[in-house]
Amino acid sequence: MNDLFSNSFKKNQAQLGDVEAGQETMNLDKFFEDVENVKDDMKGVEALYKKLQDSNEECKTVHNAKKVKELRAKMDGDVAMVLKRVKIIKQKLEALEKANANSRNVPGCGPGSSTDRTRSSVVSGLGKKLKDLMDSFQGLRARMNNEYKETVERRYFTITGEKADEQTIDNLIASGESENFLQKAIQEQGRGQILDTISEIQERHDAVKEIEKNLLELHQVFLDMAALVEAQGQQLNNIESHVAKASSFVRRGTDQLQDAREYQKSSRKWTCYAIILFIVIFILLLIPLLPHIMLMLK
């Protein structure tokens, strides 16, 4: 009867273990599917970044206001698409974070478990990739601003034959009102001769300002996601710290248990030695007395 109950208990335990293992596997399968979706979205953002880079390089070689306007429209569309995709990525990351929190309530997947560490580690990896993307777009924004400033400076020199000071260039960039700063050239050369250059500068100004506005909004979304992922990374660090401490306690406990066992073995060994020694001494003491004992018995 005891064997029957014992076997039944073991069977139930095995079935429970199988159920928990199945839940854990399903848990991770769905998780990795969601992670792949986020990675695909990131690849799309990377492709758009490459397009923006190419458009920016092309824009540097263009001297026609109409062409600048076309490139501006193209870049505006690409930046808007980037912003849209990044917002979707942010929503998916938030969903992953929520799923990770729910996963910790599943038996066998609690804080510090291999499943929880895996999930947290993967999301942290996505965060690092996002940071690289954020840095890339920040770098592009800085390059566009610097290149725009250099272009305005060159155009000013081409029209006026004079090298503009820093204040003049900054005012041109800030206002975009090229005519106000090029009145002397207009009076000397005629409005028609420099109209295209003025239009080009204006288009570049509008393009840079619009793209910068969108890139700043994009940067804010990136910062929000970075904060989310940083919290996930901190949680992972805490989990790993607790696991390390637990492992240390386990190792220490194992060492202490081993020491106790060695001490126990040593104690038993010396007890045996003491008993044997006592028996030997008893026999040695008994031998001289044997003749007297034998006489008494007779």
UniProtKB/Swiss-Prot annotation:
Cystine connections: none
Entries under SUPFAM superfamilies matching the protein: t-snare proteins
InterPro entries reported in the protein's UniProt record: SNARE, Syntaxin, Syntaxin/epimorphin_CS, Syntaxin_N, T_SNARE_dom
SMART domains given in the database record: SynN, t_SNARE
Predominant location category: membrane
Topological category with respect to the lipid bilayer: Single-pass type IV membrane protein
Residues recorded as bearing N-acetylmethionine in the entry: M1
A GO term, aspect molecular function: SNAP receptor activity
Domain annotation t-SNARE coiled-coil homology: ranges: 198-260
Residues in the Vesicular compartment per record: 296-298
Role: Vesicle trafficking protein that functions in the secretory pathway.
Protein's recorded name: Syntaxin-125
Organism per entry: Arabidopsis thaliana (Mouse-ear cress)
